[in-house]
Each structure stands twice: as structure tokens, then as C-alpha cells.
Amino acid sequence: MVINPDSWEGWYWGAMHHYGHSMRNGAFEPYGQVQDCLENCEMIVFWSSDPESSSGSYAAFEGTIRRQWAKELGVKMVHIDPHLNHTSAFLGGKWIPVLPGTSPALAHAISYVWIDEGLYDKEYVALRTTGFEKWRSYIMGEEDGAAKTPEWQEPETGVPAHVVRALAREWGNKKTYLAAGGKGTTFGGACRSATGTQWA
């Protein structure tokens, strides 16, 4: 299986048909140490990411062959997406369907579990981040009276609280590689998803 040359994602299709190749041919890996991440991770979370059909923001620079290799090594695959997309169908693993547009609530609930159970790198946060205490106050409900628990997010996302807790605990205890897709509302984001739109 190779990346879809007739992808609905504008850049990839255009590059393949205009230049005869995509930027992936002969390009370096701009997303850091992809090889190192894949060699050392125990779990990959594909969050709104379908690199088998469209590269999007995260650009799928590790490629189909590397994803297959990670699967053969026994790396657990988790897919968070409203749809059982091509990548999740191809690689298998756990699919967590989330209602469209509700990912922030899911992220807040995962963060709640990490903070509540101490499943984050406290030294890294203390040395390399700013604003953590204010954000923590919001997540824990100290700011607005609504703790962002897995139970809190369930009516909005449709993801059962026990699934969120299990994911957060596993993610917090394993070396996890986040393969996030799309670009949100930034460059190309609106058109680089199956349900996106062209704005120009």
C-alpha cells in the first residue's frame, strides 16, 4: 500500500500531477527524529490523522513502510477519529470514535487523568513550560467549578469515560508517539481533511 496518488488532499494530488512527485521524494524529515521515535515508542496515537490517504500537517514523513515496520515490532496503534479511516483499517489497533469537533474536550479529560494521577514529566514541565499552574487550575475545575474529568467529556464526545481513563493511563505509562493530523485552522488545515472545505 502506498499513499493515495488521487487523494482529495489538494497539495499531494497537485504535486503528483503537476511535478510528477510529491515533496516526500528525496526530502529530509523536518519533523525531528522520526526514526528515533519509531524505534523507541511503544504506542502511536493517530489523532485526526489518516496518513495512508492524506498527509496533512504531520505529513506522514515516516511513510507506509515504516508504519508497517512499527506494527510488526508490536507497537500499539490507537486511532482517534470520527471515522474508521484508511490508516486505522490498514494498521488495525484501537479505534476511538469521537464526535466531530469535540477533540478539545477529549484532550482536556486525558490531561485531567495525567494531572490527577501524576502521569506526566513534572521536571520537564517545571523547567520548560510556562503557564502550567493556570492551565492546571482550569483542567482541575478550580477556575470555573467544572473539573474536566472523563465523565465530564463523555456527553460531548461520545467516548465512554472508562475508555478515556484507560487511554490516558496507558499513554502516561508508555513511550508514546503522537501522530497528529490536519493543521487546524492554520495553513491548509480546512482543506486537508476529508470533511474539509476549500475557502478560496
Where does each model-flagged region fall?
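A glycine-rich, hydrophobic/aromatic-adjacent loop/helix-cap motif
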Residues: 1, 167, 171-200
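Anionic-ligand anchoring segments at beta-strand to alpha-helix junctions in alpha/beta enzyme folds, i.e.
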Residues: 1-40
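Flexible loop/turn segments at secondary-structure boundaries
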Residues: 10-11, 52-55, 85-88, 104, ...
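Short acidic, glycine/serine/threonine-rich loops at helix termini
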Residues: 16, 55-59, 88-93, 107-111, ...
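Glycine/threonine-rich flexible loop motifs
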Residues: 50-64
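Catalytic-core regions built around general acid/base machinery
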Residues: 61-74
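Long, well-ordered, tryptophan-enriched scaffold segments
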Residues: 71-78, 83-174
